[in-house]
Amino acid sequence: ATMYQNEVRFYRDLRSELDIETPQAYASSFDAASGRFGIVMEDLRQRSARFPNATGAMSEAEITSLLGHLATLHAHFWESPRFSGDLAWLWSPCSGGFHDFLRGPGLEVIRQQLEKSEYKRSLLVRLGRSLEELWTLLWRAQAILDSQPRTLLHGDTHLGNTYLVPGGGAGLLDWQ
């Protein structure tokens, strides 16, 4: 549920200060008790937006557009003192909702997923590492990331969370 809260807060609190291609939100709300949320945003079809297939291809112009938006996002918040103020609600590699999930039931959830999926088990075999080794490496990597300069990340950047606008532009959806 906290990912939904992050998305609501992005559109409500941060969207207006960024000059990037992402939908305009007209209203958003998150109910902490139920985990339910809602966002009323512009109808991107009114701008002839297309939604690419997650396994499809993008043009060089579209990729350049997306990378430009990500660079703008990262530069805007790079080492911002706001992370200790009005942005203290944002997660870091070693704090916040996803960290808390991983440190709580996360390892057991991953174990259950491995038990259910032969494909996922095969990935461990191909890596030549046990789950416990990878778990230790994950937390080592998280500590390294946490010691680096902070900025705001999209949180789930992949083709399925993008849209394409006429003229070679591309935008970002699904802010976690």
Model-derived regions: residue spans:
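Short glycine-rich loop/turn motifs
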Residues: 36-38, 149, 158-161
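Short pocket-lining segment of the protein kinase catalytic domain that shapes the ATP-binding cleft
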Residues: 39-46
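Residues forming well-ordered secondary-structure scaffolds
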Residues: 6, 20, 36-39, 58-61, ...
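Conserved NTP-binding catalytic cores of kinases and kinase-like/nucleotidyltransferase enzymes
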Residues: 1-36, 145, 152, 165-170
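Generic enzyme active-site microenvironment
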Residues: 40, 154, 172
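Catalytic activation segment of kinase domains across protein kinase-like and atypical kinase folds
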Residues: 159-176
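"Short basic amphipathic alpha-helical interaction patches in structured regions
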Residues: 1, 41, 54-57
